[in-house]
Amino acid sequence: MFKVARASQYLAITGAGIEDIKLSKKSWVFPWQSCTVFDVSPVNYTFKVQAMSAEKLPFVLPAVFTIGPRVDDDDALILYARLISPHDKDSNHVHELVEGVIEGETRVLAASMTMEEIFKGTKEFKKEVFDKVQLELNQFGLVIYNANVKQLVDVPGHEYFSYLGQKTQMEAANQARIDVSEAKMKGEIGAKERTGLTLQNAAKIDAESKIISMQRQGEGTKEEIKVRTEVKVFENQKEADVAKANAELAMKKAAWTKDAQVAEVEATKAVALREAELQTQVEKMNALTRTEKLKAEFLSKASVEYETKVQEANWELYNKQKQAEAVLYEKQKQAEAQKAQADAAFYSKQKEAEGLVALASAQGTYLRTLLDAVQNDYSCLRDFLMINNGIYQEIAKTNAMAVRDLQPKISVWNHGGEQGGGSGNAMKDIAGLYKMLPPVLDTVYEQTGMQPPAWIGTLRGAEPKQVTRS
């Protein structure tokens, strides 16, 4: 079924397919759904709230509240639809709900204030009631559109506000009498003040008139004296101007006379100067004539000699330049040769140094490799190097030469008898060699103090000697 709400109504739809409540102006309502139409137009609620002040004085607060749902807030409409819409907005349930909220907040607020505070601060009291009631109505989705709180009235049997009004009326009447008396007093005082001020102002005006008259007379006298003084000053100034003009005229006449005399002297001197200049030019022309004549006589001969000397000097200069260039070229070539030799020597030394560095690096690598091979045994490394470099052979040669020079008696060690030939003879030679080795090693140790390598064996009674290095 398709339902449409009126302008002041909403559709509250619940049921399958709707999580909570769906609000709409028009919608399809299916059989498995429920639809409630609620009106959102505001309603006037009239109350006479009975409350009690902090002094336990009762009073009645007549009020008219215009209350309705908050149509501009969907959450407030949902609250209203959930809590209020099941009841008629004009029903006793809604009326009692609103009345209970208003009475409760009004009584709580009135209990915290005295009657004097409530009566004098009626506007603030009404505002506090309005704010607190609105705060409570928010939880029902309601809003106060208008609140008209009337004048506080007494509860039957209590005449507090009547007495308070009478007190106010009496105070107003007394204040009016006081104001009238003060007005009369101010009027009489003002009249006397006006009369005194009139007399004072008249005397003041008379005195000021006399003062102004005297001032005017004095100003007239001063102006007359001032005019006379200015006339005298003007006359003196004009006389000074005439004297100054006469002096300037005399000075100009003297200057003109001086200029005329100077002009006459300058004209005379200019004539003499011009005469001297012309005489000088005549003498110069005579000298030039004689010079040209002498040039004609001697210039040709001098020119020939000059040209000859110049050519000879140029030739000598050319020869000296060429000799100097040859010497310079030879020196440059010698310097270049010396530089090339120095570069070659430097390059040779550089390469030799690089070779030594490379050899040292290779030997270092070689020694590190050997040392790692013998497990850091320096004795084995030393023996290997001596054997590899033929040190023992050199020692043997040196000892043989020394023995030969000494011509010692040679002892031959032979162990065991002779046996048959073949492989037996070869084994006999090897056995004899091994038998002769210990005496040889003993002899070497006695003469040089050097022990045989560890892989050959050790000597009995051989003690390592301490080598003292200085």
From Swiss-Prot:
Cell location: Cell membrane; Membrane, Caveola
Post-translational modifications reported in the UniProt record: May be palmitoylated.
GO CC field: caveola; endosome; plant-type vacuole; plasma membrane; plasma membrane raft; plasmodesma; plastid
Chief site of localization: membrane
CDD domains from the UniProt entry: SPFH_flotillin (cd03399)
Lipidation (S-palmitoyl cysteine): C35
One Pfam entry name: Band_7
Coiled coil region boundaries: 305-354
Gene Ontology process terms (BP): cellular response to hypoxia; endocytosis; membrane invagination
Cross-referenced InterPro entries: Band_7, Band_7/SPFH_dom_sf, Flotillin_fam
Keywords: Cell membrane, Coiled coil, Lipoprotein, Membrane, Palmitate
Membrane topology term: Lipid-anchor
Protein purpose: May act as a scaffolding protein within caveolar membranes, functionally participating in formation of caveolae or caveolae-like vesicles.
Family statement drawn from the similarity comment of this UniProt entry: Belongs to the band 7/mec-2 family. Flotillin subfamily.
Name of the protein: Flotillin-like protein 1
